[in-house]
Amino acid sequence: MLSMGISMLNSRLAEIRQQADPPFTGASAGYGDFFVAKTKSAFGIDASSKIGGIELAMKTILEEAERARRFGFTETEYDRARANYLQRVESAYNEREKMKNDTYVNEYISNFLDNEPMPGIEYEYAMMNKLAPNIPVTAINQVMQQLITDNNQVVLLAGPEKEGLKYPTKEEITALLKQMKSFDLKPYEDKVSNEPLLKEEPKGGKIISEKAGDIYGTTKLVLSNGVKVYIKPTDYKADQILMKGTSLGGSSQFADKEILNISQINGVALVGGIGNFNKVCLLYTSPSPRDMRRSR
């Protein structure tokens, strides 16, 4: 339940990061060892900011922590986080015969140093699929109320020594912490749409040729739209399909004077959204375009 609440809080922080002018350059929440103290665990939330934006970044992460404590999380947020968690557990279960050595090593280390149980993925898979569907979001919200407290707080502020750069004083930080319970906040509104990414399924093409053993044991397919597909089965993973598409051309097709503008195309494509879905809606399905080059 603890990890689920932390996951949903981090999703909210990630959404804020997608704003045109976000209050921080990065932010995250977590629960674990208090700095290097193995005997003390603590909730923590941190942010990095641009110069001159320290107070705003600090206030924003405190607002989000207080919003989670005061109002909790929504059913749709929880459904999404739980589905993602169970998918990860299922993936680990399906790949149990393909686990790398470091997975076992890390489990042994956690067991020895932190007394972390290591029942095995078979037990975890069965137990999580039995428990997770029966844990309501109200239980997660109660955990967050206990986790985020207004006492026994520690603030660490670090930054460069620079002439003219002013940092908040101890008194200003203390005053901000005391304001948390009186922040003017509204419950979080989950704006993720349930409509399909494509309103109409595109008409399928045909395979016009197939050639086995083309390159490195691949099978080459040529489609009716001219696309060439190379398929290569491997036994690296038991339940994973990887796909990548390229269209040669890219920035090499533009004049040299446009290089600065063209270098930003990939970033613009990622933040522009797709159809009726903005960047926030697509946080959980993120394509990664990049340019390829060819000679003129």
Regions found by a protein language model. Name each.
Residues 42-51, 65-72, 126-131, 247-255, ...:
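Second-shell loop/turn segments in exported
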Residues 35-41, 121, 221, 261:
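Short, flexible turn/loop "capping" segments at secondary-structure junctions
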Residues 259-267:
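Active-site recognition of the HExxH zinc-binding catalytic motif
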Residues 22-29, 67-105, 128, 152-160, ...:
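Acidic/histidine-enriched alpha-helical segments
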Residues 5, 53-60, 64, 74-81, ...:
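Stable alpha-helical elements in mature extracytoplasmic
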Residues 284-295:
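Single conserved hydrophobic/aromatic residue that forms the stacking wall/gate
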Residues 1-2, 7-14, 18-20, 79-83, ...:
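Proteolytic maturation boundary segments
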Residues 6-48, 107:
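A structural supersecondary motif
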